[in-house]
Each structure stands twice: as C-alpha cells, then as structure tokens.
Regions:
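Conserved SAM/AdoMet-binding glycine-rich loop
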Residues: 1-72, 76-77
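Alpha-helix-loop-beta-strand connector modules within alpha/beta enzyme cores
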Residues: 1-7, 65-84, 108, 135-157
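Structural preference for beta-strand elements that scaffold enzyme active sites
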Residues: 10-16, 40-44, 81-85, 112-114, ...
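Conserved strand-turn element in the central/C-terminal portion of the radical SAM core barrel
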Residues: 16-20, 46, 50-52, 74-97, ...
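Catalytic cores of alpha/beta
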Residues: 25-30, 91-107, 170
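Short, glycine/charged-enriched secondary-structure capping and boundary segments
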Residues: 28-30, 58-61, 98-99, 128-129, ...
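Alpha-helix N-cap and loop-to-helix initiation/capping positions
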Residues: 58-66, 93-100, 134-142, 180-183
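Auxiliary Fe-S-binding modules of radical SAM enzymes
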Residues: 106, 112, 119-205
Length: 205
C-alpha cells in the first residue's frame, strides 16, 4: 500500500493543498504512511494573506479562520511539518497586512514559509481587472518594505524557502516589475544590510 513511499531514496512526502481541504481522514492516512515508512510528511497550505477581505476579493473561497482551523488539525499529529504560502503584494493589501500575516504564522508556529511576489497571468479575471485599471500592484520598493517587515516578525527558526515567484514572460501581463528574480533578491539583501535588518529582529517569542 505504501510501497512507493518506502523506497530507499524517499525521505519526505510533501502535499500541497488548500487549508479548507484538511480532513482528519486524509491526515490519518498520512500519519500511517509516516509511521510505517519513517518518511517525513510536509503539508503546504496556501494562505496568501491574513486579510480575509482580500481573500474574498480574489475568490480564494476560504478565509483566515479556515487556515487556522487546518493548521490546528495538522498539529494534532506528530511528525508533520507545515509550510505556508504567502503573497505580500496582493491588490488591496498593505504593509500592515504583511505584518499581521507574519504575526499569525509566528503565533501558530509554522515551520516553513514561501513568499510569492504576485504575477498576473494572461487570460484571467485578474488580468482583466489589471488591464481595466480596477486593481494596481504596489511598487517594487513597497514590496521590499513588506518582505523586510514580514521577515523581521517571524522567528529565526522558521525556514524561508522562497522570496519571489517566477513565470515565463510570455504567460503574464505583470511579473516582478520586469526584473529577474535573482536581481530582486540581491537588491533586497542589499537593502536589508543597509537597514541592519534581519529575520526575527522584531520577533519576541
């Protein structure tokens, strides 16, 4: 039944899902896999933002409460880690939303976080809003401010596996302010050094 997971070279199973799709029956299966094979289990949940007004606007179909409920269900099981996906420049969000999201992930003791810079794919409703001027994307500098504030409010031990998204240029009408992700990373690191900023600087627990 769990033959594939028990192969010698497999050390972890990572399952990406929505927070409102977390069910005890699914977690029981993953726990059985973990116990019988010793393979680690990582669950990746897409929160995107703690601002439920924004989540509603972009038709996520869930709010912050569902995310918290899903995390608490997972934490009843031993041997599971939780990775959360966050977008810090969603239309309508502010610096305060980035800070609130960081504080919530810290309070919930999330293990891993992946930050995504918003990209707007062609032929989507968001693309239509963007081209019609219904939404605007914050500046690169404002995104840096949000990332820095976010990082300062999460603990040093929370692994950060991503800072920017990537998508082929031909598939999007907006992506990373027309700049390559590695250049953005270098700019961000330079700004953090200049501000004497670091992960966990304002995290007190």
């Amino acid at each position: 039944k769990y033959e594939a997971a028990g192969q010698r070279d497999i050390v972890e199973i990572s399952v990406s899902t929505r927070p409102d799709c977390i069910k005890t029956a699914y977690l029981d299966i993953l726990e059985e896999v973990h116990q019988k094979t010793g393979v680690a289990v990582n669950l990746e949940l897409g929160l995107q933002t703690a601002n439920y007004h924004t989540l509603d606007k972009i038709n996520r179909g869930h709010g912050l409460a569902e995310f918290i409920d899903g995390v608490l269900q997972i934490k009843e099981y031993r041997g599971f880690t939780i990775c959360t996906h966050v977008i810090l420049n969603l239309p309508g969000d502010t610096l305060r939303d980035a800070e609130e999201t960081a504080r919530i992930l810290t309070a919930l003791k999330i293990d891993i976080v992946k930050l995504h810079s918003l990209y707007i794919a062609k032929n989507t409703e968001l693309c239509e809003w963007y081209e019609n001027g219904r939404i605007a994307v914050c500046s690169k500098e404002e995104y840096f401010d949000r990332v820095i504030a976010f990082l300062e409010l999460i603990p040093e031990g929370m692994a950060v596996e991503r800072l920017f998204s990537r998508v082929p240029e031909e598939e999007a009408v907006f992506s990373n302010w027309g700049t390559s992700w590695w250049k953005l990373k270098d700019e961000l690191m330079e700004r953090m050094e200049g501000q004497h900023s670091y992960q966990g600087k304002r995290c007190h627990y």
